[in-house]
Amino acid sequence: MERKQGEVDHLERSRPLTDKERVMIQDSWAKVYQNCDDAGVAILVRLFVNFPSSKQYFSQFKHIEDAEELEKSSQLRKHARRVMNAINTLVESLDNSDKVSSVLNAVGKAHAIRHKVDPVYFKILSGVILEVLGEAYPQVMTAEVASAWTNLLAILCCSIKAVYEELGWPHLSNSTS
């Protein structure tokens, strides 16, 4: 059963990252990225198990129901690596707002135009990222670090939503994002 949208509403409000938050995000990410393949797969499997409607955008594995089978999917692993590399680029670029904007713009455009992904899934994915990282890295994802990540993911969601709006995304008025 899919969760209610309200669980990720805190991702609709963002503010600029502080220097301290940037450092916490980059330090924590360095630890997570050491296991980027496993972390990425865990994130996507959790997304697809808890929010099965998110699989509709992936013809290669949208009919796979079993979590273990999803984990073994080479296509899922490939996409998980792409997601983790995009997050890595974002985190590495936190000191360069132009680069951050460029990355988020490219991701937003690709998902709106080419993949036609409803922008609400960025909020959902962000919530899943926070959940999985908190469970997998409890010593790293302290409350303060999780708060910094929440702010970064809110920036991501707001920026991508702005890209969708700029493109005149036809479903935005119907979306809960």
UniProtKB/Swiss-Prot annotation:
Heme b binds at H79, H111. Its EC number is 1.14.12.-, 1.7.-.-, 1.11.1.-, 1.15.1.1. One of its GO terms (biological process) is oxygen transport. Pfam families: Globin (PF00042). Keywords: Cytoplasm, Heme, Iron, Metal-binding, Nucleus, Oxidoreductase. GO terms for molecular function: heme binding; iron ion binding; nitric oxide dioxygenase activity, heme protein as donor; nitrite reductase activity; oxidoreductase activity; oxygen binding; superoxide dismutase activity. It is found in: Cytoplasm; Nucleus. It catalyses: Fe(II)-heme b-[protein] + nitric oxide + O2 = Fe(III)-heme b-[protein] + nitrate; Fe(III)-heme b-[protein] + nitric oxide + H2O = Fe(II)-heme b-[protein] + nitrite + 2 H(+); 2 superoxide + 2 H(+) = H2O2 + O2; H2O2 + AH2 = A + 2 H2O. Gene3D superfamilies: Globins. It comes from the Eukaryota. Residues 16-165 form the Globin domain. SUPFAM superfamilies: Globin-like. GO terms for cellular component: cytoplasm; nucleus. The keyword Oxidoreductase applies. Probable multifunctional globin with a hexacoordinated heme iron required for the catalysis of various reactions depending on redox condition of the cell as well as oxygen availability. Has a nitric oxide dioxygenase (NOD) activity and is most probably involved in cell-mediated and oxygen-dependent nitric oxide consumption. Under normoxic conditions functions as a nitric oxide dioxygenase (NOD) but under hypoxic conditions the globin may switch its function to that of a nitrite (NO2) reductase (NiR), generating nitric oxide. Belongs to the globin family. Monomeric. PANTHER family: CYTOGLOBIN (PTHR46783), CYTOGLOBIN-1-RELATED (PTHR46783:SF1). This is Cytoglobin-1. It comes from Oryzias latipes (Japanese rice fish). The lineage of its organism: Eukaryota, Metazoa, Chordata, Craniata, Vertebrata.
